[in-house]
Amino acid sequence: MDFFPKKQPTLSNFIVGSNSEAVAVISELKEGRGPQFTYLWGYEGVGKTHLVRALGKQSEGVPAFDENRTIYAVDNVQDLTPEQQQELFVLYNTVREHPGTHLVVTADRSPKDFERQGFRKDLTSRFSWGVVFELSPLSDEQKRQVILEAASQTGLKVAPEVLNWIENNFPRDMHTMSNLLHSLDRYAMSAKRAVTIPLIKEWLERNQDTKEDR
């Protein structure tokens, strides 16, 4: 999970949880080994983009094939336009023709689910080439421990009762938690106060007032 966006995503700061097999494959790819095709899927916040960025090979959209390049990555393929789908189709075929090159794609759904979403079938059939991994989210206890550790590393102290209140009043996905902690850290520092439930409620009210003034 990518908890603090200011950090460069790496394999060392990825919280593995139950995704050890997928992380092992990404590690192999960084070393120039591993499967030619890798498909990572899962809900938002499970770490797909983190792993792609850890490869250091992410491009905007669909990258063109380059004889001097060995790893290609395409993030969030569910958002591709019809033109980009054609580009990815060509990339799949070209990579397959060049042993020693690798392609990693990520999505928010399984390859089979794409078949019911109107994507071109000759592309979605290629999503199952190579290995397919569903990334699993962290358990609530794992999330809690990582949030506390990450907050501690930035000097942000969050009491257990405050964390309980946050978990009961905000979505528990890690993107939300990460952004929330960053915002609360900045607000608490500017107010020169500790992060407490009253401070969080005050912060929420101010944000609501700001939205209404727009």
Indicate residue ranges for each PLM-predicted region:
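Dynamic helix-loop-helix/coil hinge segments at AAA+ ATPase domain boundaries and subdomain interfaces
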Residues: 1-23
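Walker A/P-loop nucleotide-binding motif
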Residues: 34-51
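Conserved P-loop NTPase "ATPase switch" module shared by AAA+ and STAND
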Residues: 63-94, 102-110
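Short regulatory helix/loop adjacent to the ATP-binding pocket of P-loop NTPases
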Residues: 111-128
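Conserved AAA+ ATPase "SRH/arginine-finger" region at the nucleotide-binding site
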Residues: 113-115, 130-142
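Short conserved motifs of the RecA-like P-loop NTPase core
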Residues: 157-170
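The conserved phosphate-sensing helix
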Residues: 170-184
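Conserved C-terminal helix/linker of AAA+ ATPases
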Residues: 188-207
